[in-house]
Amino acid sequence: MWKKVLIAIVFITSFSFAAEVKIRDEVYVEGFRPNYLTGYGIVVGLNGTGDGTTSRYTLISIANMLRKLGIYIDPAQVRTKNAAAVMVTANLPPFAKPGMAIDVQVASIGDAKDIVNGLLIRTPLYGPDGKIYAFAQGPVSTGGGFLESNKGGKVQKGFPTAGIIPNGAIVEEELPFDFNSMTEVTLSLKNPSFSKAQEIVNVINQKYPGLAVVQDPTSIKVRLPQTKNKTEFLAEILDLKIKTDKDNIPTIVFYEKTGTVIMSGDVAIDTPVYVSHGSIYVTVEKTPVISQPPPLSGGQTVVTEGVTTKVQEEKGRIISIESAKLSDLVKALNDLGVSPYDLIAILQAIKAAGKLHAEIKVM
C-alpha cells in the first residue's frame, strides 16, 4: 500500500479588530533592496542520481575543479553519476557586510534525477556587475525526497532537483551605497493605498513635523534632517506604529517544493462559484433559508441566505460544506486527496473569476 500524501495546510487566524504594526512592516525603503547573485557549481555525494555522461559541462567542470586541487584528469574519464551541475542563486540584502551568512537556492541544470542529500562544493556568486560578492557551500536540503512502499517501490514527493542551503553563503564584498550623502528617502508601500500612505505621513509628522509628504498611493517622501544621525532617524521612523485593520488584503502562500499552503482562516468566497478542474467539480452557491414562526405566535416569516459548498470527484464522491469560507473548501479538497498543484490551480481559477479576494503567492 502506498502511503497517502496529504496537503500540508497552515491556517492563520485573522482578527477583525484594529491592531498596531510598525511602519517597517508596511513599506520598503527605496534603494535599500536586495540584489540578485548567481553562480554555477557542482553538487557531489549523490546516490547514483547525478548527471549522465551526455552532460559534458559537468564532466569538464569536475575535471577543472580537480585540476585546481592539483589532480589532472581527462574529462572523458570522469563519471558523474554521483555529481550534478547546478545553478546557485541568492539575495544579497542591503548593507550586508563581509562575513554575513545568507541563504542560497540550488537547482539542477542537467539531467540529474535528484540532488537529495548532496553537498555543494564552494561556488562563487556573482552580482550584475560581474564581481564576486559571496561564496556558497554546504549540504543541500530539498524538502522533498521519496516515500517508499512495503513492496520496495517508491514515489517522488516535491521537487528533489532543487533545494536550499540555509546560511549557505558567506558575504565577501559589500555593495557600494553612500547613505550618509542622501538628503531624502522614499518609502514604498507594499500594498498601495492613499489612506494608508496618509496615515504613515501623519504618524511621522507627529514626531518630526513637516518631514514627510505623500507623493502617490505607493510612495512617501521623507526628508532626512541634517542635525540628526541619519541611520538613527530612519530606524526611529520605521519603528513608529500605525493601526492596521481587517481591510488588509489576505494572502495565500503556496510552497511548490513542499506542497505547503499558508492562508488566513477567514478568507471568504463570493457566491455563486462553479469550477471544473479535471475530475473535480466545485460549486459554491447561496440558497434561501425560510424561518417560519409557529401559528398565532405573532412572529414574522424571515428569509435568509445559506451557503452550500460542494466538492465532487468523478468517481461520485461528494462533500458538502455549509460555508463559503476558503478554509472549509481547502479542507474538503484535502479530504478528497487533491494534490497541492490541483488545489492551487483551483484557487487561482476562483480568483481569476473575481470570487476570491486574496493575494496568491507561489514560491
Swiss-Prot record:
Residues 1-18 form the signal peptide. Pfam families: FlgI. The keyword Zinc does not apply. It comes from the Bacteria. GO terms for cellular component: bacterial-type flagellum basal body, distal rod, P ring; outer membrane-bounded periplasmic space. InterPro entries: Flag_FlgI (IPR001782). It is found in: Periplasm; Bacterial flagellum basal body. One of its GO terms (molecular function) is structural molecule activity. The keyword Signal applies. GO terms for biological process: bacterial-type flagellum-dependent cell motility. Keywords: Bacterial flagellum, Periplasm, Signal. Its main location: periplasm. Assembles around the rod to form the L-ring and probably protects the motor/basal body from shearing forces during rotation. The basal body constitutes a major portion of the flagellar organelle and consists of four rings (L,P,S, and M) mounted on a central rod. HAMAP family: FlgI. Belongs to the FlgI family. This is Flagellar P-ring protein. It comes from Sulfurihydrogenibium sp. (strain YO3AOP1). The gene is flgI.
